[in-house]
Amino acid sequence: MTEEKNPVVIMETSMGTVKIELFKDKAPISVRNFLSYVKDGYYDGTIFHRVIKTFMVQGGGMDENLQPKKTKFAIKNEATNGLKNLRGTLAMARTSVVDSATSQFFVNVVDNAFLDHAGKTPDRFGYAVFAQVIEGMDVVDAIREVKTGNKGGHQDVPVEPVFINSIKLVE
């Protein structure tokens, strides 16, 4: 019996290409959700709307005018899966409500242990890691270095928009 490979996607950004492996065994709900948005072309033309050089880059839900795109239903938070918020991992973004993730995700640009599951209360539940950058971390590092400011009531917004041109499933 051969082990089925994890799905891989290619994210084309306005700053370069990032190849990402999805951990379908450890985060099946998050991966299925992410791939449903990928297959719908949902991420095409969205931006990285929150960039914090010493923390993470977040995208997957807003257009260049910071207007949120319509999302599907919220999913169960899989932060108890044992995966850690290490540099280069992707996790589902959410509100303070534990099971509120929809389309938005972030790439950890440093190890962020404080985002890992540490308890059952909302403030300690953590953020579900579901993927890992396998090529193109240099592109993510370039994104984290862009100049940011305040725009439309949001902080840490790139002054020049950084686009997700497309995300496509390759294997």
Tell what function each PLM region has.
Residues 1-171:
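Cyclophilin-like peptidyl-prolyl cis-trans isomerases
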